[in-house]
Amino acid sequence: MSLKGRHLIDPNQLSLAELDNIITLGLEIYRNPNHYREICKGKILGTLFYEPSTRTRLSFESAMLRMGGTVLGFSDANTSSAKKGESIADTIRVLDDYADLLVMRHPREGAPLLASQYATVPIVNGGDGGHQHPTQTLTDLITIHHNKGKIENLKVAFCGDLLFGRTVHSLLKTLSRFPNMEFVFISPSELKIPKHLKDEVIKSNNVEIVETTFLEKHMSEIDILYMTRIQKERFFNEEEYVKLKDSYILDLQKLRNAKEDLLIMHPLPRVNEIHPEVDTDTRAKYFEQAKLGVYVRMALMALQLGVIESC
Amino acid sequence: MLEVTSIHKGIVIDHITSGKGLKIFQKLNLDKISSPVVLLMNVSSKTLGKKDVIKIQDEVDLDLTMLGLIDQNITINLISQGEIAEKRQVKLPVKVKGLFECKNPRCITSVDDYAQSEFTLVPNGKIQYRCHYCEELTEYKL
Ligand SMILES: [Zn+2]
């Protein structure tokens, strides 16, 4: 099915074939960016950021500008026309005419879905509270595909705050739709992956999962290590935090038993969970990940705008 | 026993667990309709011992979906020409719109009037509904 004119609110709205299509096109644009420099000439991207997220916004803006389009929008709901109290439905009814595609970031969960019910142009969810962030998931998937040449038969470890980590939940749900995946969940017991999500993942594809509190325990078996931030304020007691915070700092010492082709990912920004000494290791791909995020957004928007049918 | 004459045309909500009749009366906003309505409480019942019954005379447009959420023993009798024209068992509704609120404080439905709460029943044995907007589960309690 064509992506032209369609919204993207939840990554699970995309079939595996559609995900593959977006990723393949994203990698094609990454390799030959000059071929795509003008494909969105005359198109306008509207960025409706009800809460600041500079990285996500700049990634979308860069993606549109790299295709020859233009951007307009706001990045702070308080200083914009979308002032407090105005319904999203009304904002969309007006702004819908100003752009050919809208990306919305909102602190309220479900806000982009509401927007999509009133929009005539495609809406992309740029993150809604702790709920969904589909273009981060696409970014993660393209990084996996680029480095592994496939998204299947992989053992993926998620480390850090697995309870509140939106990027982890979104990626995990999507990855569990691919064949023969195994997951390792590394987190403090207070920040374990939610049970309902675990049940859902296990049921979806009969996937194998392991839960542990030790980062190094399964290091030698995993293909991908997805690190996330642990925030101090998530802990109920200081002592527990102090005990665990160091065990989740990835350094070269902890990587000594890891596979040579391990893929180390992080949605960024990182605080201290990956030691800078890891940055120059060939397995560290988190900056490449941020870079690929631009190209996968180019592919997505080009398909939604219908300037490219498929690849 | 207290007798209430049978109605010629209307709706009889029968086999309500004793004590829940008033809640249903309120939830269906029956105090706001103009047709004659009676609420019978603690009527003796062969199967339940005691039950509540609501009789509404005339044709009234009511959303009876929520009855399944309140009490699954309920039977709805649609009366026409003095006879039971249709007998309906109530069920847990699969889709629910607007009847209760999403428990997630970060959900868009809690702040935006255009986002009317909308849920789908999760088949897990509990009366849990998944929010259409934020996907959080809300357990329905009267
Ligand atoms: Zn909700």
Swiss-Prot record, chain A:
Catalytic activity: carbamoyl phosphate + L-aspartate = N-carbamoyl-L-aspartate + phosphate + H(+)
EC number annotated for this UniProt entry: 2.1.3.2
GO molecular function terms listed in the Swiss-Prot or TrEMBL record: amino acid binding; aspartate carbamoyltransferase activity
Gene3D superfamilies reported for this sequence: Aspartate/ornithine carbamoyltransferase (3.40.50.1370)
Zinc found in the keyword field: no
Key words, A-Z: Pyrimidine biosynthesis, Transferase
Superkingdom of the organism of origin: Bacteria
Record-linked InterPro entries: Asp/Orn_carbamoyltranf_P-bd, Asp/Orn_carbamoylTrfase, Asp/Orn_carbamoylTrfase_sf, Asp_carbamoyltransf, Asp_carbamoyltransf_Asp/Orn-bd
Positions that bind carbamoyl phosphate: R55, T56, R105, H133, Q136, L268, P269
Annotated L-aspartate binding sites: K84, R166, R229
Pathway: Pyrimidine metabolism; UMP biosynthesis via de novo pathway; (S)-dihydroorotate from bicarbonate: step 2/3
GO biological process: 'de novo' pyrimidine nucleobase biosynthetic process; 'de novo' UMP biosynthetic process; amino acid metabolic process
UniProt entry tagged with the keyword ATP-binding: no
Catalytic EC class: transferase
Subunit structure: Heterododecamer (2C3:3R2) of six catalytic PyrB chains organized as two trimers (C3), and six regulatory PyrI chains organized as three dimers (R2).
Similarity annotation: Belongs to the aspartate/ornithine carbamoyltransferase superfamily. ATCase family.
Role this protein plays: Catalyzes the condensation of carbamoyl phosphate and aspartate to form carbamoyl aspartate and inorganic phosphate, the committed step in the de novo pyrimidine nucleotide biosynthesis pathway.
The protein's name in its UniProt record: Aspartate carbamoyltransferase catalytic subunit
Species: Alkaliphilus metalliredigens (strain QYMF)
Lineage: Bacteria, Bacillati, Bacillota, Clostridia, Peptostreptococcales
Name of the gene: pyrB
